[in-house]
């Protein structure tokens, strides 16, 4: 068996519709688009959210909220992700080096999700109560 002899099983693939190829094909002449109208034209159709000229839903509803600038530079880190980081001392730079958080991140908070078996020292990271208990139970410690 070689790569050039492989083929999908019989009946596993459907042939694509061939439209506009004569009356006998069942999809000739208008090619399944019907007669006239905007959708029969090439490039026809309306944009997403268009409701025929009626004020669309996304404009009928009021604007609300905002995007926190701090949320863009803050990351949540799971305990299971901490287990993947090499070394005993973990800080923001070691998380970035291990590709756990992106380079633009300035703050990280450790969440209780997954588990950690080895003792680690967290330096300069925020930690939830549950994650703190799990880290200390594994013999680790948290430095502010």
Curated annotation (Swiss-Prot):
Gene3D superfamilies: 3.100.10.10
Keyword terms of this UniProt record: Ribonucleoprotein, Ribosomal protein, RNA-binding, rRNA-binding
Keyword Metal-binding among UniProt keywords: no
GO molecular function: rRNA binding; structural constituent of ribosome
Keyword Ribosomal protein: yes
GO biological process: translation
Entries under InterPro entries matching the protein: Ribosomal_uL15 (IPR030878), Ribosomal_uL15/eL18 (IPR021131), Ribosomal_uL15/eL18_sf (IPR036227), Ribosomal_uL15_bac-type (IPR005749), Ribosomal_uL15_CS (IPR001196)
A Pfam family it matches: Ribosomal_L27A
Residue spans of biased composition, Gly residues class: 21-31
PROSITE patterns hit by this protein: RIBOSOMAL_L15
Disordered: annotated span: 1-53
SUPFAM superfamilies: Ribosomal proteins L15p and L18e
Superkingdom of the source species: Bacteria
Record-level GO cellular component terms: cytosolic large ribosomal subunit
Subunit-structure text: Part of the 50S ribosomal subunit.
Family named by the database record: Belongs to the universal ribosomal protein uL15 family.
Function text: Binds to the 23S rRNA.
Record-linked HAMAP family: Ribosomal_uL15 (MF_01341)
Protein name: Large ribosomal subunit protein uL15
